[in-house]
């Protein structure tokens, strides 16, 4: 037949135009088709046959095909068939004019599957009708709907069905879904041919018997046993061959109807027109003795198909010549047609098995026999225990053994029981259960029989055995497709398919397969479901993406930290995140700002938010928190204080952002996503952090940032964060350290990839402040007591910029550089500890620090930013201009809190200072803060400096002014530290209270200050001194206060920092040391002053001397009463209590006095600046190693040339000589601001004077009081440094500091040229160093810079 039908190739070409191209592709290209068991006929033949019979089947009158049929059907029989085709009364194919839609509507069974296209391929599987032949996946399903004779010259594209199926078979699983649909359809199709639509649409309980039990895989479609075919009453579905042998009924047995007809067709017509349609919406079979027992069908077509059982109508005839097969269900016909076409849409679902079958039943048989030993299809007839591997065999069994009436109806399938149970039980259980249920349902068989079980479960849960077959790893998409060729519920998705994985658990599924076969299918499906459930459940527990608990703080917590606060491994990052926050941090993780991980990592993290365990990163890593915005979603984590409260674990987004930013900067990675409010947060959050209760937090405030962007060990005795007790030990997962965890040294966090801020000198409170401050600073390592503090300037600046300032900055919304904000925050905390307003007042000094930083940075920008901060932070605080220098006492108290402020200052270190390398300032912030307090006068100095027009300092105008004042203090004796402060240990800074008072006194003596400033202006300050423009804006009182305040703040022991016993001891030690140094210097002071005055920098020397005299006079004033011209423990310990006025007067009068003022800061011997100091990075590491290197500011200044170097805490070793061991910022720079504009930093850079005998380079020959106020206190928030430093281990290397200031601190404030201009000092510290080693006094330059910047800042703040 095939040979006869084989059309010439031309036919294929002509008949099969591009539409068939796909089909051709499938058929022609898939050699598997033949191999798969296609008819020996070539594809084209088969196709033609399919099309021909298809055409016949679809439309008897091939009118629509006629035009094409001649060409299309190469075989002569094609037209013959068309003409011969007998129109079935009800058959949708009966009328050629009927399109698929019509057929679907008219023939309940025939095309329902097509309509629903549950089995898109099933529709294709119909062979000639292959609506879905081309699997829906191929997109032909709809196209194939054109199978209707009208579909085109092709009639229905048999090729399509064949193609799709063949394609499926040939390609194996590629067409799986179509196949599964096909397979469902096929399984259904044969029985469907009898009751096709009825079985499909209805659950075909009765009709389902007809329907294929076919493979369990064909979930919804094939097997009534499976419940899919509940509606399929036809056992004949068995392979489509076993439709019930209907009696050729011609008499109507409808209730109350006894009509008789001559032909079956008439009977069918009668039933359809009189009874079924008469039933209207009630689709109940009233046929006498109907097993449905009046149970209604869901749809009319189901009833129509059902009635075929009674009438024996088989409208669906095989169109192939010589084949007389007819089926009551179209789907059965389609399945049958596959035998002619060789189409095998049902592919074995077992992995690795490519066998394809024309019907689902065969596939189920194959799968169950070959790939498993299961016999899921159990005969449910009571007393029968037969089991079969496939539904067709079961149907055969039932039909032959139990009789044609023993339809595999619901009673046989045991749908009710099986449905509920099979999904839950293993296939074996299902089998047993299926049997039991079969029995149970057998008892209820009558009702069950008529009952439509398919749609409920079969469609849902019952995949075809193939679809769900245990052997198949997956249901073929087709299998999963609910193809009820029978037309039952085709849309229902079989629960068993993987696509239905979600449904598997829920699906009692296989139970609905009411037959033993169905139960067998259920077993298989249950196996599959079990597997799937395991997969599902396992995934739910294992495979499912689960977010591991992120809250663990432990090592796992590290992972969770990554996950949660990802960027921040709690333990490893200095930042600790609460365990709970980890989970919350999943949300925050989205924020890449905080994460230490790269954004890429963050991305993975985000994707892996599920994966709570992210690689742990050491908190010590500077950039650990780079990616995450905020590790903790916890509001507390976000809240500055809350974050701080929890310790680092609660880093705020800003803090985390900074950490990440630093990390990114360090790693060169992209900057973290800025927080929406990050910039303000920089100041605000930091400030909040600094101001938060964490002031006492374990984090030693700002880690010093080195220009090298690396954490450098302070020379000797420096404690690395990891080295700090518990600092390195704590893992990211470890609980966040509380403020009390002072011992825990935070690892240095890179901020902005600039430099690691080393927590060096900052007080532990500073650390806590830093921690409280959060931000990247919060990540800064906490050095228990860094032997080597960061540069004084850094500390000073940090102190200067206190949380209060930061807060004000936040409040005022100033846009400040991150550095500025950080410093301000740091300082603000210190100032908060001391007096927020003082800080504000001190703000200019902060700016001075900033100026130092600016000196370091060579930017007045920072000063301006600081000014902004100051304005923001302090303008509100009070006396931004005035700086409440008289509040220096408060400042002193404040400096008690200054350590906290230092800590805060340390926190700000992370900001842009990294780039400038001024991060050292944060460490020095306490000193700087002291300077701030002294800086109020310093601000006055700035104001005076503002009067100075030195263009060079214009950038750093405020800082220059500051620096000028400070330089006036520092230049002579000490190298100008970055902050223009000699960074003295916090203890030294404790003495700044008296200078603060002096500042107030300075404020009281504006004229003197003015005079001094005037001299200062005349003195060759660095161009920063020239930047006196700010000074004009700076309140002279501020400048005065600044001058006094600096010394006060530096000197006031109690106020600056919280007086912890250790800190007190340190302060006392420092004070004693400073006093002793000062005493030495006072002893040497006269000649030092003489040297200073006489030595190079004559201009400055004279000016300084004059200033010193003036300053002495000024300091002699009540303002300066606290300053003692001669060093005395009292002076150092309580500068205010010192007879500083007289001493200052003396100092003013004599260079010695000036050099020796409390303002004068002891400096390390004036040896040549160590290279390490010259290079802040290396020197910072070595700072502790050598006095010169001791000054963290040395390195920091190196890192940021503009940075005001803060002298490290003065240690007794510094006492070697006044010149070498101590730098006194006697500062010619007395800022007597009779008027802000007039104030000129008289602080002569006179290295001679500054040297105070060349040894006391740090001293300004200007009034010792003033210098005490400015240089000592303002230049060095030494308290922090002292706090940070281990006083016992720390050697104060003022020379190093000054040297550092020389290069970095002096950058613009006191240019080496200016110092060089001083005959005495070839370098800034030359005077100092001339005594020990001539070194230009960078401190003076920085001081000038600071003063200038302070003046500018004050001006700015005033404008604010």
Swiss-Prot record:
Keyword Protein transport: no
SMART domains: ZnF_C2H2
Zinc finger map (C2H2-type): 250-275, 316-340, 346-371, 377-402
UniProt xrefs under SUPFAM superfamilies: beta-beta-alpha zinc fingers (SSF57667)
A Pfam cross-reference name: zf-C2H2
Region (Interaction with DNA): 298-306, 360-365, 390-396
InterPro entries membership: GLI-like, Znf-C2H2_ZIC1-5/GLI1-3-like, Znf_C2H2_sf, Znf_C2H2_type
Bias kind Polar residues: ranges: 474-496, 1173-1190
GO terms under biological process: cell differentiation; positive regulation of DNA-templated transcription; positive regulation of transcription by RNA polymerase II; regulation of transcription by RNA polymerase II; smoothened signaling pathway
Basic and acidic residues biased stretches: 230-245
Gene Ontology CC annotations of this record: cytoplasm; nucleus
Compositional bias segments (type: Low complexity): 461-473, 1134-1143
PANTHER family: TRANSCRIPTIONAL ACTIVATOR CUBITUS INTERRUPTUS (PTHR45718), ZINC FINGER PROTEIN GLI1 (PTHR45718:SF2)
Family listed: Belongs to the GLI C2H2-type zinc-finger protein family.
Role according to the record: Acts as a transcriptional activator. Binds to the DNA consensus sequence 5'-GACCACCCA-3'. May regulate the transcription of specific genes during normal development. Mediates SHH signaling. Plays a role in cell proliferation and differentiation via its role in SHH signaling.
Name of this protein: Zinc finger protein GLI1
Organism: Xenopus laevis
Gene: gli1
